Amino acid sequence: KQMPEWTAKRNANMARIQAVFEHSPYFTVPKPSSDYVHAAYKCYVQVNVDALPECWSRDRIMAEISAQAVPCFSGSCSEVYLEKAFDETPWRPKTRLANAKALGESSLMFLVHPTLSEHSLQKTVDAIQSVIAKIHA
């Protein structure tokens, strides 16, 4: 019963976070096609690592946002095949998958669940804005 409402709320939360990143050359905001409704269980943004000033990295951005008591994570398990469980199995590729590696090294993930308060969401937006301002300084 509540899935449509929750999905709409997650998408609205994701849109607010994405809007903060959209105009910075240091980030890529993936936008799904309008042909379907994104489930938006998490909000992912890619850091354009090569565009960052020398003293900045994805990990520093993550640490700076987290230091403001805002949950910010490295994202998905893009190369799960590197886990020990895949040792000695036919499911590990012979060479690392280039796109999976790049996404794993550049992703930032933010929470967008429908129970986030307006205060929490605004705190997230404010933290991201302050870190982007530091990068641009």
Residue ranges and their predicted role:
Residues 1-137:
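PLP-dependent aminotransferase class I/II
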